[in-house]
């Protein structure tokens, strides 16, 4: 599917933007795909660029993602925490797996979901092949990442670590209300006016 273009007129000049670049002008980043290394590089670059433009102004990360590669997601997560600009997160459609992790990692008080979105958390998945010693090494690394993700999710949601471990043992689906009660989001939005009341 071709990327839509937007034409803007300023005085006598016209300028064409692809839709994602136009959204970036409004400090909006869209994560609408599975998370892999290429996507993570693009998201991180946009976060760093927007921080350099204005380190105090909010950045809005819209999420509709089934999740993806854990290390790629952690690159986005670490960049969100590293930059000084606050990052608001908003789930539209679904935020599953690493998508839900990034949703929860938004600025406290600025983590949103639309009414018909869904959120899913679970433990990281991985496949290993090769010699027995290599499989053992990879299995231990997956367990290390699982523990680390659970610790981070516990911190951002305010849930006890034991509860995070229990609920991520299998796919755990939530609607917006349950996600709010769980601490993954702060508010459910029904219209843009709900955000504009807070200054955006």
Curated annotation (Swiss-Prot):
InterPro entries the UniProt entry points to: ClpP, ClpP/crotonase-like_dom_sf, ClpP/TepA, ClpP_His_AS, ClpP_Ser_AS
GO molecular function: ATP-dependent peptidase activity; ATPase binding; serine-type endopeptidase activity
Protein's UniProt keywords contain RNA-binding: no
Keyword Lipid metabolism: no
GO CC entries: cytoplasm; endopeptidase Clp complex
Residue positions of the active site: 97, 122
A Pfam family hit: CLP_protease
GO BP annotations listed: protein quality control for misfolded or incompletely synthesized proteins
EC numbers: 3.4.21.92
CDD domains: S14_ClpP_2 (cd07017)
Organism superkingdom: Bacteria
Keywords: Cytoplasm, Hydrolase, Protease, Serine protease
Known catalytic reactions: Hydrolysis of proteins to small peptides in the presence of ATP and magnesium. alpha-casein is the usual test substrate. In the absence of ATP, only oligopeptides shorter than five residues are hydrolyzed (such as succinyl-Leu-Tyr-|-NHMec, and Leu-Tyr-Leu-|-Tyr-Trp, in which cleavage of the -Tyr-|-Leu- and -Tyr-|-Trp bonds also occurs)
Main location: cytoplasm
Enzyme class: hydrolase
PROSITE patterns reported in the protein's UniProt record: CLP_PROTEASE_HIS, CLP_PROTEASE_SER
Subcellular location: Cytoplasm
Role: Cleaves peptides in various proteins in a process that requires ATP hydrolysis. Has a chymotrypsin-like activity. Plays a major role in the degradation of misfolded proteins.
Assembly notes: Fourteen ClpP subunits assemble into 2 heptameric rings which stack back to back to give a disk-like structure with a central cavity, resembling the structure of eukaryotic proteasomes.
Family as reported in the entry's similarity comment: Belongs to the peptidase S14 family.
NCBIfam families: clpP (TIGR00493), PRK00277.1 (NF001368), PRK12553.1 (NF009205)
Name of protein: ATP-dependent Clp protease proteolytic subunit
Species of the source: Oleidesulfovibrio alaskensis (strain ATCC BAA-1058 / DSM 17464 / G20)
